[in-house]
Amino acid sequence: TNQMRIATNSSKIDISKENKTASLAKIFSTFLSKGDIVFLHGEIGAGKTTFVRYLINYLQLRSKKSLSEVTSPTFNIMNEYQIKNLIINHFDLFRIEKTKDLQNTGLFNDYKSKLTLVEWPEKIISKPKSRYELFFTFNKNTNKRFIKIKKIIFDLEIKENLGENKYVQIKGDASFRTFLRKSKGKKSSIIVYCKKEKKKNLLNYDAINKNLIKNKIIAPKLYYQNYKNNFIEIEDLGKKTIFEIFSKKNNDNNLK
């Protein structure tokens, strides 16, 4: 199977074609929320700002906002974007030379209420422990560009064109879990990912589902689990919520 994994420590993805950069940025954007910090490493021309542009534009599209012209804040140091209640701070630290200059940027001020994207993070001495790290490389001889993702999201398998499966974030429960609908043609499944919860919480979620099925109560079947990286893939029972289903049943009964 000609597949690659997008988010393990050994991931190396060919993004030489811009549509691959766009597809990967779209998928990656579904995992980001307030408080997340993303470091983008790589030389000039490696594709960092292009990736950020698609990332921000996809977040804007998802919120039905007009698209911004996203450029590298080389001289401004930081550009800010607001998408509804999400503030995105895009930093470029290339021109920063002294620690004092870095402190004046307000880099991690109130970061928990924002999404922080940082190009040239090598200038930062005291780095936050929780962060995503993207490493961009560019081979001038072959004109090839690659990206590695260091912080594990999950080892989601994707075809090399990065466009065969579609991923759409859907409403979940009141927990920190993230739910994605993975689809290809008429086939679909649900990815349940726990970014902020412990392994125990995901095991409990799985155990409850198994118990429901055992007692002949409709619940999604488990297709694949990776408890080490905090995600499972389960059956997609449809797009309607339980409230919509019961509402339809009540209406049908009233008609009778």
Protein language model annotation of sequence segments:
Residues S183-K256:
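ATP-binding pocket architecture of kinase catalytic cores
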Residues N57-E69, I83:
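Post-Walker A helix-loop "phosphate-sensing" segment adjacent to the P-loop in P-loop NTPases
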Residues L162-S183:
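ATP-binding glycine-rich phosphate-binding loop
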Residues E43:
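P-loop (Walker A) phosphate-binding loop of NTP-binding proteins
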Residues M4-R5, S11, K100-L102, F108-K159:
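Short phosphate-coordinating micro-motif centered on Lys-Gly-acidic
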Residues M4-I27:
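N-terminal pre-Walker A segment at the start of P-loop NTPase domains
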Residues K48:
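Conserved lysine of the Walker
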Residues V38-L40:
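Hydrophobic anchor at the beta1->P-loop junction of P-loop NTPases
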